Amino acid sequence: MGTVVQLKNRINNSYSELKNSVEEKLVLVEEKIKLKLSSKVSLVDEMTSYHLRTGGKRLRALLTLGTAKICEYSKGGRDINLAACVELIHAATLMHDDVIDKSKIRRGKKTLNSIWGNQSSILVGDYLLSRCFEMMVEDGNLEILKLLSSTSAEISQGEVLQLQHKGEIDMLEETYLKIISAKTASLFAAATKVGSILANKENKIKEALEFYGKNLGLTFQIADDTLDYNSELKFFGKKIGNDF
């Protein structure tokens, strides 16, 4: 357990360094997300505003901004738009995930489904995904559109696979890794690869960053699941054992 906590601390330290390096752009990502989530339906506005107030590290958005920076992307604000897009995919999966798991608490606060019910939460999650795809089409890069579309499909398949094996105490390591690779690591991998695509880097750099993102995502989820297995609600911010 101590090793996992140390690993989480190392990730948090690296996160702080990354955030500091792109902090100005992250502010613009937040503004872009708020703008894109604006709706003519008052309940949608109410629910998305609540979700934004619950916070979040914006880690996947930071990975897109960070990789775009190290790949020397400097033309316009496409990195900001696509970082917002990646974050919207993540937010939508959380909303759907909370409904599936019947979660009442996330980040120490009530989930959308515990306040507004399952139907509204699912539809608002779908709304986020539709806004995300709208942004991808506006960006106009088919490679990015294909990457994030296939990633969204992979996340859904990972969630279904997890449901299929939920509660299995004797789950094979291979099955567990397949689940977290799809539902978590795939979006980390996409977030890091997008930055290199924006900068028109050669395939070996794209593949290297994608590989890095995937392994970071696996590490993150393994640490998160270990804490889920052996932690306390007041420290973890959500119901313990929900992912098992």
Predicted feature locations:
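Mid-bilayer segments of alpha-helical transmembrane spans in multi-pass integral membrane proteins
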Residues: 119, 151, 155-159
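Divalent-cation-assisted or electrostatically stabilized phosphate/pyrophosphate-binding catalytic cores
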Residues: 106-128, 170-184, 207, 211, ...
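Active-site alpha-helical segments that house and flank conserved acidic catalytic motifs
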Residues: 79-103, 153-154, 185, 189, ...
